[in-house]
């Protein structure tokens, strides 16, 4: 005779086994395969950001209210962040880049925490935050690396490469290694935190629906915002380091 409690344990383990990592909905584009679910949610995120920008600036007022007030607050926050990390002289041209990085990661992270993507069925895998995919975070990290290389080289020219042998040529291997570790740390930090948060919430919802996961979901929202801030701050700091004049 089968014990009912054993059946309950079996059903619970079966539900947990459905919490999967690495499932992808592939799109075939020529000879390349792309992660379709990442593109779908990325388009959703970009639509939110663009819509907010349009609604916040379509009828500008001297005394901002509503959406315009919110957009101006976000812009001031990003501007202050860039100014602090990059410096008064060079920050203005980098505000759009830092703002785009911050907003994309922030909205992506929150979309994964707030939007019930699991209710939308796709042929394979499941929809989730774009930052839940290592390809997205790696692309953002590489874009940041290219940006600070460009920032330093465009301002200093060939003098930029002097930083690799300063204050002594002995540090050349370490300085070169640092350029490889920066994008790695950026991408894996963001990917690991977002993936872990979604997995923990997914498992707890399976075990104890609604009651226990709610505080963790709220904590996840806070963590998601912090991760966006950390990524944008480090990106701005790397650019500031590249354009800084050493005397």
Curated annotation (Swiss-Prot):
It comes from the Eukaryota. The keyword Cell membrane does not apply. Pfam families: ATP-synt_A. GO terms for molecular function: proton-transporting ATP synthase activity, rotational mechanism. The keyword NAD does not apply. F-type ATPases have 2 components, CF(1) - the catalytic core - and CF(0) - the membrane proton channel. CF(1) has five subunits: alpha(3), beta(3), gamma(1), delta(1), epsilon(1). CF(0) has four main subunits: a, b, b' and c. This is ATP synthase subunit a, chloroplastic. It comes from Mesostigma viride (Green alga).
């Amino acid at each position: 005779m089968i014990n009912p409690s054993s059946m309950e344990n079996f059903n619970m383990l079966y539900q947990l086994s459905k919490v999967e990592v690495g499932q992808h909905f592939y799109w075939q584009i020529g000879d390349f395969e792309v992660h379709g679910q990442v593109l779908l949610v990325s388009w959703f995120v970009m639509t939110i950001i663009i819509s907010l920008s349009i609604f916040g600036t379509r009828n500008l007022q001297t005394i901002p209210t509503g959406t315009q007030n919110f957009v101006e607050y976000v812009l001031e926050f990003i501007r202050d962040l860039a100014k602090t990390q990059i410096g008064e002289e060079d920050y203005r041209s980098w505000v759009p880049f830092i703002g785009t990085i911050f907003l994309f990661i922030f909205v992506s992270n929150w979309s994964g925490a707030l939007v019930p993507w699991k209710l939308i069925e796709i042929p394979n895998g499941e929809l989730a935050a774009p930052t839940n995919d290592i390809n997205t975070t790696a692309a953002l990290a590489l874009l940041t690396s290219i940006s600070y290389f460009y920032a330093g080289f465009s301002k200093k020219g060939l003098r930029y490469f002097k930083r690799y042998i300063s204050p002594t040529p002995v540090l050349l291997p370490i300085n070169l290694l640092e350029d490889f570790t920066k994008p790695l740390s950026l991408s894996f930090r963001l990917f690991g935190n977002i993936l872990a948060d979604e997995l923990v919430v997914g498992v707890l919802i399976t075990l104890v629906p609604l009651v226990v996961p709610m505080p963790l979901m709220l904590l996840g929202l806070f963590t998601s915002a912090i991760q966006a801030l950390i990524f944008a701050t480090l990106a701005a700091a790397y650019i500031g380091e590249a354009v800084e004049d050493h005397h």
